[in-house]
């Protein structure tokens, strides 16, 4: 259980220092990160040449608005876009999708740390100032909206970040999340589902003719984990991916109930989780080896999701 299939211990150069990882996790898992120091921009990943070039002229595709949190924003994936406080990449999946579709117009208002209230009504604080509610970007002319949200609502990234273990002698932290027989994350998912439904309704009210797609979270870790390559107890690894699955399944149900679509990114990220060899990863681990924030998609992951989404949109769902 030292490493999952495809993992090579010798292929982990240039790991980000633990202190930087701690800063990034703090910045990415709270909306109010006004005082966080600027995060460094890492060098271009080896797969960057495969990314479609940004800056293309508007095409004949849909008028597109991308909403969501850091899973969509792709923090620290080159190049970082304005506003810098949102830690948003010009090569996140929304940008890849927009370029692949030849979007007639494109507004990427995703922002790391966003919760549902930041999409709907709250000016989200960032380290460079507040940004308007993301819903402000949606108009009656909008034809396509993608949304990735929910992880921060239930504090899943923050909880995962606090559960790193240096020894298997330390009890798994997932046991602490079940109190009196009630799973705290499961309870939060159910409690927030109405807010996600309300968000969809608000989008449909502003853009009645728009195609709305809720984009899920991926396969972050294989069931057995890969301790000690990634400092996650195998019990916690299985638990947290189960919670991601639970979140995705609930978002899928919300989409079905509200008459919109859900795009499941889990199948395409199987085998590309934090335990994969560095060149195969779509999601980085606690100490990224490709330019990305800890426990977030890298450039290859954003490219894969954006490309798959473009195929899905073009095929009509």
Model feature map: region roles:
Residues 1-30:
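Sec-dependent bacterial lipoprotein signal peptides
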Residues 17, 28-52, 56-57, 317:
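C-terminal region of N-terminal signal peptides and the immediate post-cleavage residues
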Residues 46-113, 164-170:
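Serine-esterase "nucleophile elbow" of acetyl-processing enzymes
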Residues 63-68, 72, 105-110, 143-148, ...:
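Structural recognition of the beta-strand scaffold that forms the well-ordered cores
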Residues 77, 128-187:
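Oxyanion-hole/transition-state-stabilizing segment in secreted/luminal serine hydrolases
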Residues 113-132, 275-289:
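Charged, often glycine-rich, active-site loop that binds/positions anionic groups
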Residues 144-147, 168-204, 213-262:
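Conserved N-terminal glycine/acidic-rich loop preference
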Residues 218-317:
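Catalytic His-Asp segment of secreted/periplasmic serine-dependent ester chemistry enzymes
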């Amino acid at each position: 259980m030292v490493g999952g299939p495809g993992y090579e211990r010798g292929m982990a150069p240039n790991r980000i220092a633990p202190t930087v990882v701690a800063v990034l996790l703090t910045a990415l898992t709270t909306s109010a990160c006004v005082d966080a120091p600027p995060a460094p921009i890492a060098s271009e990943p080896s797969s960057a040449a495969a990314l479609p070039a940004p800056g293309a002229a508007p095409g004949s595709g849909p008028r597109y608005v991308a909403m969501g949190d850091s899973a969509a924003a792709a923090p620290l994936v080159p190049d970082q876009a304005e506003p810098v406080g949102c830690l948003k990449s010009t090569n996140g999946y929304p940008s890849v999708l927009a370029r692949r579709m030849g979007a007639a117009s494109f507004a990427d208002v995703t922002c790391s740390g966003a919760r549902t209230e930041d999409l709907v009504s709250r000016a989200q604080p960032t380290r460079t100032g507040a940004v308007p509610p993301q819903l402000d970007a949606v108009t009656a002319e909008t034809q396509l909206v993608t949304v990735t949200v929910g992880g921060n609502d239930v504090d899943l990234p923050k909880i995962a970040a606090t559960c790193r273990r240096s020894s298997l002698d330390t009890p798994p932290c997932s046991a602490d999340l079940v109190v009196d027989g009630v799973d705290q994350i499961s309870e939060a998912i159910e409690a927030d589902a109405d807010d996600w439904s309300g968000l969809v309704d608000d989008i449909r009210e502003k853009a009645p003719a728009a195609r709305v797609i809720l984009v899920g979270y991926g396969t972050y870790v294989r069931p057995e984990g890969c301790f000690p390559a990634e400092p996650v107890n195998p019990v916690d690894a299985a638990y947290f991916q189960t919670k991601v699955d639970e979140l995705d399944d609930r978002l899928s149900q919300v989409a079905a109930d509200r008459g919109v679509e859900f795009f499941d990114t889990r199948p395409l990220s199987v085998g590309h989780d934090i335990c994969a060899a560095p060149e195969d990863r779509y999601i980085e681990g606690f100490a990224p080896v490709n330019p990305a924030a800890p426990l977030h998609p890298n450039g290859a992951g954003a490219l894969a999701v954006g490309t798959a989404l473009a195929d899905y949109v073009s095929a009509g769902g």
